[in-house]
Amino acid sequence: MKTLAIELRKEKRNGVIPVLLAVGVLGAAYAFVNFIMRKDTLLNLPLAPMDVLLTQLYGMIMVLNLFGIVVATCMIYNMEFKGSAVKKMYMLPVSVPAMYLCKFLILTVMFLVAIVLQNLALAQIGMMDLPDGAFEMGTLVRFAGYSFLTSMPVLSFMLLISSRFENMWVPLGIGVAGFLSGMALANSGLALLLVHPFVIILKPAVAMSAQPDSTVALVALVETLLFLAVGLWLAKYRRYE
């Protein structure tokens, strides 16, 4: 708990928490503005109202979420790398793996808050603007959970990368390259491409149905835990040079 409290203070100071809160607010605002401007066009699409609400608005929200994750993870080790502080932590009564786990938990919780803010906006739109009886809260909750879960491999992967490179431009470049390659591959039906975390985060955005894909969700969970385990192992056994 002490490590978590210290990390919370650090992430407030280096801007990680404000970045993810801003992502949630901007995503919610985008949903409102987009639906207001395109309401008639969206509701006339040959899709079920809930599919329109969730899949047609999620694309840009996903981009905001992705770059919010990339920026936050690039910033999260900034304080540790200043003055090579992270190298000295091994001589202090501080657990570097515990610090890594706390950073992961803080990122996860704050990203979940962002997802909740965005989906509160979608719920408001659904209750107010969809045809009577068309809004389904259960469908919204399932899609929100699905979009959160499919984003977690990128968060876990980017934290792993950021923890190993002192120059934040390296993980930032990897994040941008991952996004571009994910965009190019997301529409492919080849299951092997699901090993690419940036393909997984794009799956809800390119789907025409709001129903979660259980295969994608399972792979997302496995990748998230795998990247987390690798990051914890490196933090414990691979000291910073």
Residue ranges and their predicted role:
Residues 24-71, 101-165, 206-211, 215-219:
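Secretory targeting signals
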Residues 73, 84-85, 157, 197:
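Hydrophobic alpha-helical segments typical of transmembrane helices
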Residues 1-24:
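Aromatic- and glycine-rich beta-strand/loop motifs that create alpha-glucan
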Residues 19-25, 165-183:
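Pore- or pathway-lining transmembrane helices of multi-pass membrane proteins that form conduits
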Residues 67-81, 159-169, 224-237:
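Transmembrane alpha-helical segments in integral membrane proteins
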Residues 77, 86-89, 121, 125, ...:
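Hydrophobic alpha-helical interface/terminus motif in multipass membrane transporters
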Residues 33-53, 172-241:
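Terminal transmembrane helical anchor/hairpin motif
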Residues 76-108:
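Helix-loop-helix units of permease transmembrane domains in multi-pass membrane transporters
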